Amino acid sequence: MQPQYRNTVERMYRGTFFYNFNNRPILSRRNTVWLCYEVKTRGPSMPTWDTKIFRGQVLRSKAKYHPEMRFLHWFREWRQLHHDQEYKVTWYVSWSPCTRCANSVATFLAKDPKVTLTIFVARLYYFWKPDYQQALRILCQKRGGLHATMKIMNYNEFQDCWNKFVDGGGKPFKPRNNLPKHYTLLQATLGELLRHLMDPGTFTSNFNNKPWVSGQHETYLCYKVERLHNDTWVPLNQHRGFLRNQAPNIHGFPKGRHAELCFLDLIPFWKLDGQQYRVTCFTSWSPCFSCAQEMAKFISNNEHLSLCIFAARIYDDQGRYQEGLRTLHRDGAKIAMMNYSEFKHCWDTFVDRQGRPFQPWDGLDEHSQALSERLRAILQNQGN
């Protein structure tokens, strides 16, 4: 017996998809929420049981008209007939859930442990409001198991959504030019909102400060922001997180994008006022020449913002990296190598350590001292 479908459509037009699933972080006149869902029965083959689309007006005062609530109403009826079956549910939504919908979904999942939900969102709805942030944290928090997994749609998810739910007329999905940049902004914002933490193995592998390492082609950048108030630097915990470089051909970046440039994209999105701010970055590699030049330009154009960079290792591409570091230092950035204190601070602040203390690796202090001397020589233009 199949359940009755209400307020659903099978496919959407191409124009509807591009208009509503535009991932520009701030958009107006997008009052309809589109929720494309896929339900699979859990098992070795995980066959797809159903795929359809709910839609609803996001600004309606009654949350029952929102597509998330319509899905829950429909799915509850189905679960009454198939309460023993385990399901894996995937949503592709144009807006992330509002506060009431997020709370309702969290309650539903808490009562039905046989259902797992992954939510891919094109944009974040009212992400700057504290009550909304708290609702999403409750929805995605761990309570004996992950309740819901929420991710920003990247190129692959947009393509999957296009293939499964759009009447594309046989044409392939063609992303907008700014899709990768917007993805990075939204991904970092969601990480701040949900207070994502780094895996311990990722931290120790990428932030190990051995001067010469092989296979470490990624750059991780942890950041925090403070505001000067009555001669005291006050942490802004809403702007704290980490990001990594985007590799070529991943998430729609044909040429890739370094972590420092992704971070520079993010700062204007915070809309900081004219007060004095201090931004501190902890990076697994020091900036390359191009990134150092861009960071120098940024702080020169934003005199109310000071920048401190603590690097685990010096990025040596045999090019103009030394010149870039000197330019960045000359334009006002503080650049230093991470020592035990900074490594411990990163571990305590950005890593999912689960109560475990930071354990320094062999040679940490010696490597830090040697790298500090090398950096000092570079900044003083004495070679390396």
Curated annotation (Swiss-Prot):
This protein is called DNA dC->dU-editing enzyme APOBEC-3G
* Major localisation: cytoplasm
Q: What organism is listed for this UniProt entry?
A: Macaca fascicularis
Region listing for Essential for cytoplasmic localization, in residue ranges: 1-61
- GO terms, biological process: cytidine deamination; cytidine to uridine editing; defense response to virus; DNA cytosine deamination; innate immune response; negative regulation of single stranded viral RNA replication via double stranded DNA intermediate; transposable element silencing
Recorded domain comment: The CMP/dCMP deaminase domain 1 mediates RNA binding, RNA-dependent oligomerization and virion incorporation whereas the CMP/dCMP deaminase domain 2 confers deoxycytidine deaminase activity and substrate sequence specificity.
Answer yes or no on keyword Metal-binding. Answer: yes
Q: Where is the active site?
A: E260
* UniProt lineage: Eukaryota, Metazoa, Chordata, Craniata, Vertebrata
Name the PANTHER family on file: DNA DC-DU-EDITING ENZYME APOBEC-3G, MRNA EDITING ENZYME
Top-level EC class, please? hydrolase
Q: Which residues are recorded with the post-translational modification Phosphothreonine? A: T32, T219
Q: Which family does it belong to?
A: Belongs to the cytidine and deoxycytidylate deaminase family.
Described function: DNA deaminase (cytidine deaminase) which acts as an inhibitor of retrovirus replication and retrotransposon mobility. After the penetration of retroviral nucleocapsids into target cells of infection and the initiation of reverse transcription, it can induce the conversion of cytosine to uracil in the minus-sense single-strand viral DNA, leading to G-to-A hypermutations in the subsequent plus-strand viral DNA.
